[in-house]
């Protein structure tokens, strides 16, 4: 079994991102962990001390706050609108085509620009929906009005908590509980969990 990713926070408790267990151990070894949370402990063993013969051990929890990882203005900018990729877009939209309402696997889905790029539309969360290939082909490079099509749901920009949930398919229960505390009541993600 592989070790799950660790949820890294700033000292104020704002989620920063997912890190590997190796990164978490490094933060511990350098004394950069401000505090820890979560119910899951992971113990890692290193080499043996020449002086004492004892084996080194570092324990980390599933959620750690890292010194110097303060979000501040930079973090606010990063999480204002996170980068879009197809996998996260499809997960945000729950694999549901915005036009026909059918659920598909990733290989049958496409990214559709509600307002076409050729007409000045942006590649941003609020201008993107998940569409099956036939519906995207039918809409083509036209506006909804010109294509005589309607959206079944409204796109939205995920907040940092939603974004981190969308990024990781193997979230531990304590990590999910922490992240769900920052997910808005109206979010589609709440309907899944």
Give the residues covered by each predicted segment.
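Short helix-coil boundary/hinge micro-motifs
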Residues: 1-81, 86, 157-193
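Histidine-centered nuclease catalytic patch
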Residues: 82, 102-130, 139-155
């Amino acid at each position: 079994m592989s070790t799950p990713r660790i949820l890294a926070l700033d000292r104020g408790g704002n989620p920063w991102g997912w890190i590997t267990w190796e990164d978490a151990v490094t933060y511990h070894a350098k004394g950069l962990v401000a505090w820890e949370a979560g119910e899951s402990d992971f113990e890692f063993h290193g080499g043996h001390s020449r002086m004492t013969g004892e084996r080194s051990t570092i324990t980390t929890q599933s959620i750690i706050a890292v010194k110097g990882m303060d979000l501040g203005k930079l973090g606010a900018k990063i999480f204002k609108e996170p980068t879009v990729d197809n996998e996260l877009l499809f997960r945000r939209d729950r694999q549901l085509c915005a036009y026909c309402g059918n659920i598909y696997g990733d290989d049958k889905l496409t990214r559709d620009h509600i307002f076409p790029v050729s007409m000045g539309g942006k590649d941003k969360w609020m201008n993107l929906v998940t569409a099956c290939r036939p519906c995207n082909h039918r809409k083509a490079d036209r506006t909804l009005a010109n294509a005589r099509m309607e959206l079944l749901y409204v796109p939205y920009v995920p907040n940092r908590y939603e974004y981190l949930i969308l990024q990781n398919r193997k979230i531990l229960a304590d990590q999910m509980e922490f992240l769900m505390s920052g997910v808005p009541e109206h979010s589609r993600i709440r309907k899944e969990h």
